From Swiss-Prot:
The gene is groEL1. This is Chaperonin GroEL 1. Belongs to the chaperonin (HSP60) family. Its EC number is 5.6.1.7. CDD domains: GroEL. One of its GO terms (biological process) is protein refolding. Signal peptide: none annotated. It catalyses: ATP + H2O + a folded polypeptide = ADP + phosphate + an unfolded polypeptide. HAMAP family: CH60. Keywords: ATP-binding, Chaperone, Cytoplasm, Isomerase, Nucleotide-binding. Together with its co-chaperonin GroES, plays an essential role in assisting protein folding. The GroEL-GroES system forms a nano-cage that allows encapsulation of the non-native substrate proteins and provides a physical environment optimized to promote and accelerate protein folding. GO terms for molecular function: ATP binding; ATP-dependent protein folding chaperone; isomerase activity; unfolded protein binding. The lineage of its organism: Bacteria, Bacillati, Cyanobacteriota, Cyanophyceae, Synechococcales. It is found in: Cytoplasm. ATP binds at residues 29-32, 86-90, 413, 479-481, 495.
């Protein structure tokens, strides 16, 4: 396909046009008085949302060159989303401000490479300052405030996430599901839960609720299919003597063996239940090993030279209680903290080493199941459109609270970046010179952009608000919801330091890339061929 090649100023201006379009569409959502954006969907109802990165992903322009600008700034938003899970709109507004200021300097003859160096050095300095400013949080109240701000000032959501964090701890997983009612509810599971239920309903001990509840059971873990009941007989005999229940977790149990277990269960010879192992392939094995660590048992696998027919009682795991229904199994075990801690550290190391987001997610899930539990927030809303918007806000709120627990909090509402402008100017004047200093000044001039936009969305004059904030103490900022200047930390208007840091780093990175662009190679727009002329009369007895 033929390409269009554009150089110098013309290339940068085309990118700028695309960046302007995207930044304006996203910036309208910023702050407590930010508006919503409606996304038209080819199929289904339109979506009304307030989430920067989701809007950015939807924007495609007709002009290929302008679309390249959109894609670049979209990257700033999605990288921030990947790192911190929130702050995507702030990253977009910052990147836009840096690009606008930088392009003016490049047009005036500044060297783009030196400007980029200055931008990078300024960004590194600011990151270290944000780390210094960050206050660690531990109390539930501060966590709730963080969630409230990220969810668009919804206090109920903030409190719910703080409760969930309290119950499942730092390593726990908080997942979102679409609820069945109008209200949003929180459901917390203690212990390890996985999505496999009993193989046969005959294992249920409570026929009304169709649940199998085993107290203080032995747990047999194996990664192979159990085909013959003879393999199980030695273990079953040993357990029958103890009078305790048994849970079997295996890849599968064939009909003959299953029938024998069911008959024993119904006759009251042995209280037994069988469940298929969760996951597939290597992941299944890893999850079974996690269960073995949790229940203080051994995974009976041929890789370790162990066979079912010579399994001993001491190889089996134990738990305080196991609850099984048709879809899920929950194991509540205790008293094996040291081994579980070691296993958790091992999983954390694997998480640090992997680059795949999917693998990281799965490892995080395993970690949560081992370390303390899973909380499920069931999102309730009147309509599907509202449900989708609520779900995105909740996702941001969960990510923001996790980021806050990780790296601490800073004053919110664009306040931190605005105050840091003076520190950056002082540092740049004494450490940088020439065009690198101009690069740092570009960053310094852009730092107030998020605050100005928050103020403008609330109907105030952005430039005036920014100047007023700069003249006040470092934790003071502008509360756009009320129009007052207040101590942001005391009022609970806070941002996670990680969100502020990621947004700034990604914005600086994209701005540097755009400024150093000297040529764009893009596809030529395809010429639409005229439709062929209609055929003549078809003849015959019919009118066509």
């Amino acid at each position: 396909m033929a390409k269009r090649i554009i150089y110098n100023e013309q290339a940068r201006r085309a990118l700028e046009r695309g960046i302007d379009i995207l930044a304006e569409s996203v910036a309208v959502t910023l702050g407590p008085k930010g508006r919503n954006v409606v996304l038209e969907k080819k199929f289904g109802a339109p979506q009304i949302i307030n989430d920067g990165v989701t809007i950015a992903k939807e924007i495609e322009l007709e002009d290929h060159i302008e679309n390249t600008g959109v894609a670049l700034i979209r990257q700033a938003a999605s990288k921030t989303n990947d790192a911190a899970g929130d702050g995507t709109t702030t990253a977009t507004v910052l990147a836009h401000a840096m690009v606008k200021a930088g392009l003016r300097n490049v047009a005036a003859g500044a060297n783009a490479i030196s400007l980029k160096k200055g931008i990078d050095k300024a960004s590194d300095f600011l990151v270290s300052k944000i780390e210094e400013l960050a206050k660690p949080i531990s109390d539930s109240n501060a966590i709730a405030q963080c969630g409230t701000i990220a969810a668009g000032n919804d206090e109920e959501v903030g409190q719910m996430i703080a409760d969930a964090m309290d119950k499942v701890g730092k390593e726990g997983v908080i997942s979102l599901e679409e609820g069945k009612s109008m209200t949003t509810e929180l459901e917390v599971t203690e212990g390890m839960r996985f999505d496999k239920g009993y193989i046969s309903p005959y294992f249920a001990t409570d026929t009304e609720r169709m649940e199998a509840v085993l107290d203080e059971p032995y747990i047999l873990l194996t990664d192979k299919k159990i085909g013959l009941v003879q393999d199980l007989v030695p273990v079953l005999e040993q357990i029958a003597r103890t009078g305790k229940p048994l849970l079997i977790i295996a890849e599968d149990i064939e009909k003959e063996a299953l029938a024998t277990l069911v008959v024993n269960r119904l006759r009251g010879v042995l209280n037994v239940a069988a469940v298929k192992a969760p996951g597939f392939g290597d992941r299944r094995k890893a999850m079974l090993e996690d269960m073995a660590v949790l229940t203080n048992g051994q995974l009976i696998t041929e890789d370790a030279g162990l066979k079912l027919d010579n399994a001993k009682l001491e190889m089996l795991g134990t738990a305080r209680r196991v609850t099984i229904n048709k879809d899920t199994t929950t194991i509540v075990a205790e008293g094996n903290e040291t081994a579980v801690k070691g296993r958790c550290e091992q999983i954390k190391k694997q998480m640090d080493e992997t680059d795949s987001t999917y693998d990281k997610e799965k490892l995080q899930e395993r970690l949560a199941k081992l370390a303390g539990g899973v909380a499920v927030v069931k999102v309730g809303a009147a309509t599907e459109t509202e449900m989708k918007d609520k779900k995105l806000r909740l996702e941001d709120a969960i990510n923001a609270t996790k980021a806050a627990v990780e790296e601490g909090i800073v004053p919110g509402g664009g306040t931190t970046l605005t105050h840091l402008a003076a520190d950056l100017q002082k540092w740049a004047n004494s450490n940088l010179s020439g065009e690198e200093l101009i690069g740092a000044n570009i960053v310094e001039a852009s730092l107030a952009a998020p605050l100005m936009r928050i103020a403008e969305n609330a109907g105030a004059n952005g430039a005036v608000v920014a100047e007023n904030v700069k003249s006040r103490p470092i934790s003071d900022g502008y509360n756009a919801a009320t129009g007052d200047y207040i101590d942001m930390l005391a009022a609970g208007i806070v941002d996670p330091a990680k969100v502020t840091r990621s947004g700034l780093q990604n914005a600086a990175s994209i701005a540097g890339m755009v400024l150093t662009t000297e040529c764009i190679v893009a596809d030529l727009p395809e010429k639409k061929e005229a439709a062929p002329a209609g055929g003549g009369g078809m003849g015959g007895d019919f009118d066509y």
